[in-house]
A protein has these predicted regions:
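Conserved catalytic-core segment of nucleotide-activated headgroup transferases in glycan assembly
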Residues: 1-67, 150-153, 164, 184, ...
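A generic local structural motif
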Residues: 3-7, 34-36, 80-84, 102, ...
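Short, conserved catalytic or adaptor-binding loops enriched in Gly and charged residues
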Residues: 11, 66-73, 135-143
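Donor nucleotide-activated moiety binding/catalytic core segment of transferases
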Residues: 60-104, 109
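Catalytic binding pocket for nucleotide-activated donors in carbohydrate/polymer assembly enzymes
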Residues: 101-180
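C-terminal alpha-helical cap of glycosyltransferases
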Residues: 185-213
Length: 213
């Protein structure tokens, strides 16, 4: 994916673009603080694209229309509910999300920073702390960007400004993070395919050996 991104023609613009890409879980950005976030971020010279989770669009069309109506007169805000293209994802200068996995795809591919809103985390294993290892999706947040609490939306303009002023620093930091924690970078498909083929061949050979005895 990185290779494909690096080959893409990059659009040059004097206007910094911000992508807001929430997750689909309880108390996500859309359901908790999106209106306040947009109210604080608009009017600062950015192009802001809100790309809700597809499930939000499917199950809460009234909420999507409410957002479109509320910000209809704000030329710097787009509520995007057409997912036929992912160009807005990779063209954005930074992303704002909560716990969505899209942050990995975005940051690891583009080496661009992410601002995380610390909405309640979706916990699949309520006893995860007994393992004694902090999940990567918690501690990596400040490694590839910055974090704010939902009740700190008044700080959005200053934090976004600081992040965008230090994109080169984040680029280097994220690239180092990816090379340290992502294995088989750039050739994982080949490694995965080789593993599957070798596993199948071993099974076949084991079966033949058992039958020949």
């Amino acid at each position: 994916m990185r290779d494909d991104y690096n080959k893409m023609e990059k659009k040059v613009s004097d206007v910094k673009s911000i992508l807001i890409a929430p997750s689909w879980q309880k108390d996500n950005i859309v359901d908790s603080c999106l209106d306040e976030l947009l109210d604080n971020l608009k009017g600062h010279g950015y192009k802001i694209t809100v790309r809700p989770h597809p499930q939000h669009v499917r199950h809460m069309p009234e909420r999507m229309q409410q957002l479109k109506d509320r910000f209809a007169n704000d030329d710097d805000i787009e509520i995007q509910t057409d997912f036929s293209s992912n160009s807005t994802v990779f063209e954005a200068d930074m992303m704002i999300t909560d716990w969505s996995g899209i942050c990995y795809e975005y940051a690891y591919t583009t080496c661009k920073p992410v601002l995380f809103i610390d909405t309640p985390m979706k916990v699949m294993n309520p006893e995860y702390e007994k393992i004694g290892v902090e999940p990567i999706n918690i501690w990596m947040r400040d490694s590839i960007g910055a974090s704010l609490k939902p009740d700190e939306m008044d700080r959005i303009p200053e934090v976004v400004d600081q992040i965008l002023k230090h994109t080169e620093d984040y680029k280097q930091k994220i690239d180092e993070f990816v090379h340290e924690y992502v294995y088989n970078l750039g050739n994982s498909a080949q490694v995965g395919a080789d593993y599957i083929i070798n596993a199948v061949v071993r099974k076949i050979n084991d079966k033949k050996n058992k039958e020949s005895k």
